[in-house]
Amino acid sequence: MSDMYKKDIEIDVDGVLADMDGNYTPYIIDIIPDFTEEKYITGWSMPLVAEKYPEAFKRVQNLWVNPDFIYSLPKFEKVIEGMKELGLFYKDKGQITVHTHLFDGGPVYESRYRWLEELREESNVDFNINISVGEHKKTLETTKILIEDSVRNLQKSNADYKFLIRRCHNRDFTEKDLGESKESFVVASFYDAVQKIKSIKF
Protein backbone atom coordinates (compact mmCIF):
# COMPACT_ATOMS: atom_id res chain seq x y z
CA MET A 1 0.00 0.00 0.00
CA SER A 2 1.18 3.54 -0.79
CA ASP A 3 2.65 5.42 2.14
CA MET A 4 -0.02 8.12 1.75
CA TYR A 5 -2.59 5.65 3.10
CA LYS A 6 -0.44 4.42 5.97
CA LYS A 7 -1.07 6.94 8.72
CA ASP A 8 -2.24 4.95 11.73
CA ILE A 9 -0.46 3.91 14.90
CA GLU A 10 -1.59 0.37 15.76
CA ILE A 11 -1.15 -0.81 19.34
CA ASP A 12 -1.58 -4.37 20.59
CA VAL A 13 -3.09 -5.02 24.03
CA ASP A 14 -1.90 -8.23 25.75
CA GLY A 15 1.81 -7.99 26.40
CA VAL A 16 1.86 -4.31 25.41
CA LEU A 17 -0.79 -2.51 27.45
CA ALA A 18 -2.19 -5.35 29.59
CA ASP A 19 -0.06 -7.74 31.63
CA MET A 20 -1.51 -11.14 30.79
CA ASP A 21 1.50 -13.45 31.16
CA GLY A 22 2.35 -12.02 34.56
CA ASN A 23 -1.05 -12.94 35.99
CA TYR A 24 -1.32 -16.70 35.41
CA THR A 25 0.39 -17.69 38.66
CA PRO A 26 -2.63 -17.92 41.04
CA TYR A 27 -4.42 -20.23 38.62
CA ILE A 28 -1.65 -22.79 38.15
CA ILE A 29 0.59 -22.54 41.22
CA ASP A 30 -0.85 -25.78 42.62
CA ILE A 31 0.51 -27.57 39.54
CA ILE A 32 3.70 -25.55 39.05
CA PRO A 33 4.71 -24.25 42.51
CA ASP A 34 7.74 -22.31 41.24
CA PHE A 35 5.96 -20.81 38.23
CA THR A 36 7.26 -17.47 37.02
CA GLU A 37 6.94 -15.81 33.64
CA GLU A 38 10.72 -15.66 33.32
CA LYS A 39 11.25 -19.36 34.02
CA TYR A 40 8.34 -20.99 32.23
CA ILE A 41 7.16 -18.75 29.40
CA THR A 42 10.00 -19.54 27.05
CA GLY A 43 8.15 -18.99 23.76
CA TRP A 44 4.84 -18.10 22.15
CA SER A 45 1.97 -20.30 23.40
CA MET A 46 4.09 -21.46 26.35
CA PRO A 47 5.70 -24.57 24.78
CA LEU A 48 7.45 -25.66 27.99
CA VAL A 49 4.24 -25.55 30.02
CA ALA A 50 2.21 -27.19 27.26
CA GLU A 51 4.66 -30.09 27.04
CA LYS A 52 5.43 -30.73 30.71
CA TYR A 53 2.26 -29.53 32.43
CA PRO A 54 -0.69 -30.01 30.05
CA GLU A 55 -3.30 -29.49 32.76
CA ALA A 56 -1.78 -26.13 33.69
CA PHE A 57 -1.67 -25.15 30.03
CA LYS A 58 -5.34 -26.09 29.66
CA ARG A 59 -6.18 -23.76 32.55
CA VAL A 60 -4.26 -20.95 30.88
CA GLN A 61 -6.12 -21.54 27.63
CA ASN A 62 -9.38 -21.28 29.56
CA LEU A 63 -8.24 -17.95 30.97
CA TRP A 64 -7.85 -16.58 27.44
CA VAL A 65 -11.64 -16.87 27.02
CA ASN A 66 -12.59 -16.00 30.60
CA PRO A 67 -14.38 -12.60 30.70
CA ASP A 68 -13.51 -11.92 34.34
CA PHE A 69 -9.83 -12.65 33.80
CA ILE A 70 -9.66 -10.50 30.67
CA TYR A 71 -11.34 -7.57 32.39
CA SER A 72 -9.17 -7.87 35.51
CA LEU A 73 -5.81 -7.63 33.73
CA PRO A 74 -3.65 -4.82 35.11
CA LYS A 75 -2.04 -2.24 32.88
CA PHE A 76 1.72 -2.17 32.65
CA GLU A 77 3.49 0.69 34.37
CA LYS A 78 3.14 4.11 32.69
CA VAL A 79 0.59 2.94 30.10
CA ILE A 80 -1.71 5.86 30.91
CA GLU A 81 1.16 8.35 30.72
CA GLY A 82 2.35 6.86 27.45
CA MET A 83 -1.10 6.96 25.89
CA LYS A 84 -1.58 10.59 26.92
CA GLU A 85 1.77 11.58 25.43
CA LEU A 86 1.11 9.65 22.23
CA GLY A 87 -2.35 11.18 21.87
CA LEU A 88 -0.96 14.70 22.11
CA PHE A 89 1.96 13.97 19.79
CA TYR A 90 -0.01 12.19 17.07
CA LYS A 91 -3.38 13.99 17.13
CA ASP A 92 -2.77 15.89 13.86
CA LYS A 93 -0.84 13.11 12.13
CA GLY A 94 -3.24 10.15 11.99
CA GLN A 95 -5.47 7.75 13.90
CA ILE A 96 -4.41 5.73 16.95
CA THR A 97 -5.94 2.25 16.80
CA VAL A 98 -5.78 -0.19 19.67
CA HIS A 99 -6.06 -3.56 17.94
CA THR A 100 -6.51 -6.64 20.10
CA HIS A 101 -7.08 -10.32 19.41
CA LEU A 102 -9.43 -12.70 21.22
CA PHE A 103 -10.16 -16.36 20.61
CA ASP A 104 -13.86 -15.92 21.38
CA GLY A 105 -16.60 -13.31 21.10
CA GLY A 106 -19.58 -12.77 23.37
CA PRO A 107 -18.86 -11.99 27.04
CA VAL A 108 -15.07 -11.99 26.64
CA TYR A 109 -15.39 -9.50 23.77
CA GLU A 110 -17.55 -7.27 25.95
CA SER A 111 -15.00 -7.49 28.79
CA ARG A 112 -12.12 -6.46 26.56
CA TYR A 113 -14.16 -3.64 25.02
CA ARG A 114 -15.04 -2.34 28.50
CA TRP A 115 -11.36 -2.55 29.52
CA LEU A 116 -10.43 -0.45 26.49
CA GLU A 117 -13.23 2.06 27.04
CA GLU A 118 -11.90 2.63 30.54
CA LEU A 119 -8.42 3.16 29.12
CA ARG A 120 -9.89 5.78 26.80
CA GLU A 121 -11.44 7.58 29.76
CA GLU A 122 -8.33 7.36 31.95
CA SER A 123 -6.00 8.60 29.22
CA ASN A 124 -8.47 11.04 27.63
CA VAL A 125 -7.40 9.73 24.21
CA ASP A 126 -10.22 8.85 21.81
CA PHE A 127 -8.42 5.98 20.09
CA ASN A 128 -10.15 3.58 17.72
CA ILE A 129 -10.95 0.11 19.12
CA ASN A 130 -10.49 -2.85 16.78
CA ILE A 131 -11.03 -6.39 18.11
CA SER A 132 -10.10 -9.40 15.98
CA VAL A 133 -11.86 -12.64 16.94
CA GLY A 134 -10.77 -16.10 15.83
CA GLU A 135 -7.66 -18.21 15.47
CA HIS A 136 -5.42 -15.43 14.15
CA LYS A 137 -5.24 -11.67 14.44
CA LYS A 138 -6.05 -9.86 11.22
CA THR A 139 -3.51 -7.56 9.59
CA LEU A 140 -4.43 -3.90 9.16
CA GLU A 141 -3.32 -2.24 5.93
CA THR A 142 -3.21 1.41 7.06
CA THR A 143 -0.65 0.97 9.85
CA LYS A 144 2.37 3.25 9.77
CA ILE A 145 3.66 2.37 13.23
CA LEU A 146 3.00 -1.01 14.87
CA ILE A 147 3.59 -1.73 18.56
CA GLU A 148 3.35 -5.48 19.27
CA ASP A 149 4.75 -8.30 21.37
CA SER A 150 4.04 -10.91 18.67
CA VAL A 151 6.91 -11.44 16.26
CA ARG A 152 4.53 -13.19 13.85
CA ASN A 153 2.19 -10.21 13.69
CA LEU A 154 5.10 -7.85 13.16
CA GLN A 155 6.43 -9.99 10.34
CA LYS A 156 3.02 -10.02 8.61
CA SER A 157 2.58 -6.26 8.82
CA ASN A 158 3.63 -3.77 6.15
CA ALA A 159 4.09 -1.02 8.76
CA ASP A 160 6.91 1.45 8.16
CA TYR A 161 8.03 1.40 11.79
CA LYS A 162 7.85 -1.69 13.98
CA PHE A 163 8.24 -1.93 17.74
CA LEU A 164 8.65 -5.26 19.51
CA ILE A 165 7.84 -5.00 23.20
CA ARG A 166 10.29 -7.31 24.96
CA ARG A 167 8.56 -10.11 26.84
CA CYS A 168 9.80 -13.48 28.03
CA HIS A 169 8.11 -15.31 25.16
CA ASN A 170 10.01 -13.26 22.54
CA ARG A 171 13.35 -13.10 24.34
CA ASP A 172 15.23 -14.77 21.47
CA PHE A 173 14.22 -12.26 18.76
CA THR A 174 15.88 -9.03 17.63
CA GLU A 175 15.08 -6.14 15.29
CA LYS A 176 16.28 -8.24 12.36
CA ASP A 177 13.47 -10.77 12.92
CA LEU A 178 10.54 -8.37 12.53
CA GLY A 179 10.13 -8.32 8.76
CA GLU A 180 10.53 -5.54 6.22
CA SER A 181 10.19 -1.95 7.44
CA LYS A 182 11.87 1.42 7.30
CA GLU A 183 13.07 0.90 10.85
CA SER A 184 12.49 -1.63 13.63
CA PHE A 185 13.06 -1.43 17.37
CA VAL A 186 13.03 -3.68 20.43
CA VAL A 187 11.97 -1.79 23.55
CA ALA A 188 11.17 -2.68 27.15
CA SER A 189 7.73 -1.10 27.37
CA PHE A 190 4.92 0.75 25.64
CA TYR A 191 6.09 3.94 27.31
CA ASP A 192 9.59 3.46 25.88
CA ALA A 193 8.06 2.92 22.43
CA VAL A 194 6.20 6.23 22.73
CA GLN A 195 9.41 8.08 23.60
CA LYS A 196 11.10 6.61 20.53
CA ILE A 197 8.14 7.45 18.28
CA LYS A 198 8.35 11.08 19.38
CA SER A 199 11.93 11.18 18.09
CA ILE A 200 11.13 9.82 14.61
CA LYS A 201 11.30 12.33 11.76
CA PHE A 202 8.24 11.56 9.63
Give short role names for the model-derived ranges.
Residues D34, G43-K84, L88:
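Metal-dependent phosphoesterase signature
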